[in-house]
UniProtKB/Swiss-Prot annotation:
One GO cellular component term noted in the UniProt record for this chain: cytoplasm
SMART domains tied to this protein: SprT
Keywords: Cytoplasm, Metal-binding, Zinc
Name under which the protein is recorded: Protein SprT
Intracellular or extracellular location(s): Cytoplasm
Note accompanying the cofactor annotation: Binds 1 zinc ion.
GO molecular function term, any single one: zinc ion binding
Family according to the record: Belongs to the SprT family.
PROSITE patterns xrefs: ZINC_PROTEASE (PS00142)
Length: 165
């Protein structure tokens, strides 16, 4: 991970913790931060570990959005857990931390271009359309651990033999 981006990420995280400490009038431990999330997820909060993990590829491609939205989003999960315990991940407590404490819209999903981090996909067909299945789902079909059906016609999806990406 780029040293400058890593530094900025840690600074945003510390700033969020500081805002939370002022709002809740108590101290919070500084979380650890790593850059090892893979796939389409931008970040993940590990509540019991007090740790934030970020996707390094998406971070490099979308640094401003990570600094302004993703990192506060993940810190809000940690703060919510430490203040309220186990509650719904994007429930009213988390939304309150995002909006009232951090002053940020409580968005639950990102809108980043994920082509660079998207895994292999395989074409499957039913009676009415085609579907791209992830490599994980494709492998489950090959190992006969799962079958998938169309949401419209309810027919089983069958592999066409085409790898899409």
């Amino acid at each position: 991970m780029d040293i400058e981006l890593s530094y900025k990420a840690k600074q945003v995280m510390v700033d969020c913790i500081s805002l939370a400490q002022q709002a809740f009038k108590r101290s919070f431990p500084i979380p650890s931060i790593t850059f090892n999330v893979r796939g389409k997820a931008a970040g993940k909060a590990y509540l019991q570990l007090n740790q934030i993990r970020l996707n390094p590829i998406l971070f490099r491609e979308n640094p401003q959005a990570f600094l302004e939205e993703v990192i506060p989003h993940e810190v809000a999960h940690l703060i919510t857990y430490q203040v309220y315990g186990r509650v719904r991940p994007h429930g009213k407590e988390w939304r309150g931390v995002m909006e009232s404490v951090f002053g940020i819209s409580a968005n639950t999903t990102h809108r980043f271009e994920v082509t660079s981090v998207q895994g292999k996909t395989f074409e499957y067909r039913c009676g009415c359309m085609t579907y791209p299945l992830s490599i994980r789902r494709h492998n489950k079909v090959l190992r006969k651990e799962a079958t998938y059906s169309c949401q419209k016609c309810h027919q089983p999806l069958n592999f066409t033999g085409v790898q899409l990406s």
